Structure formats: C-alpha cells, structure tokens
Regions:
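Alpha-helical transmembrane cores and adjacent cytosolic helix/loop segments
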Residues: 1-197
Length: 197
C-alpha cells in the first residue's frame, strides 16, 4: 500500500505542478508560479527518493561489499542541490517582479487553482498519515506532514492573491518567501543526508 500511496502522491503533484505553473504564467502571478515549481520539486524529490531507496535495498555484491545504502544518501544530496537551485531561481524572479510589479490577470483562475491545490494536498496528507500510522511508516507520516505544510502554503498564496489588489507587492513578497522556504527545505534534506552517513 505504501508504494501505491507514493505513486498516487507523485501523480497528484504532477497535476498540481502543471496546473499551478500554467495558471501562474497565464495570470502573471509569481507566487502561483513559485508554488507550481515547489510542487514540481516535490515530484522530483519523491522520484529521486523512490529510486534511491529502491537501489539502496539491493543486497551487497562484489563491487559494493557494504551494500548500496549510500545511493539513498546520494539521492538526498541530489535533491538538496535541485531544491537549492530552484529556491534561488524563485527568489531572483520574485526580486525582478518586485522591481516591476503588475496586477494579476484572471485572479479567479489563480484563486481556484490554489483552493484546488489546498484540497488535494489535504486529502493526500490524510491518506499518507492514515496509512503511515497503519503500516508504521515514518517516511509516509513525514510525507503526510509535508503535504499538510503544502496545504498552508496554498492557503497563504490564496490570501495573498486577494491582498494583491490592495498592495501590488504582495505576490512578489510571497514568491520570495516560498523561495526561502524551498532553500530551508534543501538544507534540512542535506542535513538528513549528512547525518545518515
């Protein structure tokens, strides 16, 4: 069941990433676009982790007498670098948007995609936490908590889209904060990878 939930989660994040990135571009919203990139990074992180764990479970062989567990650590470092680069890119784009602010086009579309994102992430959070507890999987519970954090991120962007009407810099400030959050996440994952050595 763990693998099934992981696959559903990856599929959900692919749909959310595509929706948010498209709507972010169409509506000229840096924060919605940044959230889309964040969802896309969740997909890459999940895939890298999935394959890293799969390889690390291989038994020891002639070339790897101590096993393959370091592949999982290597996957963690790769995720760290991807997230760090993404966070820095989002911060740069937010800064550019802050220098040249503009109103969000089609705000109803941007608002709709963020509410949809919050609902999907809440459903995924509940599923992961439920099955994580049922199957005693710390990884699944942790991923469920991560999905719950994504719910709050979507709601913050939703509120920001409403406030952007009153303060034009809201969107770029939120995109900047999302970029900082992604960088913070990259350091957390990097620390976990180092600690597991």
């Amino acid at each position: 069941m763990k693998e099934k939930i992981a696959k559903i989660s990856i599929l959900a994040n692919v749909i959310l990433a595509g929706g948010k990135i498209s709507v972010g571009i169409l509506s000229n919203s840096a924060s919605v676009f940044a959230e889309g990139i964040h969802s896309l990074m969740d997909v890459f992180s999940s895939l890298i982790s999935f394959f890293g764990i799969k390889i690390s479970k291989k038994p020891a062989d002639k070339e790897h007498p101590y096993g393959h567990f370091k592949f999982e650590v290597l996957a963690g470092f790769l995720i760290t670098l991807i997230l760090l680069g993404t966070g820095l890119g989002i911060i740069y784009e937010a800064y550019q948007k802050f220098k040249n602010p503009s109103l969000i086009k089609i705000p109803i579309l941007a608002l709709s995609v963020m509410i949809f994102s919050a609902l999907i992430n809440e459903i995924m959070a509940r599923l992961k936490i439920h099955f994580g507890k049922k199957e005693n999987s710390v990884a699944l519970i942790s991923d469920g908590v991560h999905s719950r954090v994504d719910v709050f991120a979507s709601l913050v962007v939703f509120v920001g889209l409403i406030l952007n009407k009153y303060w034009i810099f809201t969107d770029s400030v939120l995109a900047f904060l999302i970029g900082l959050y992604i960088i913070k996440e990259s350091f957390s994952i990097g620390k976990e990878a180092i600690d597991s050595l």
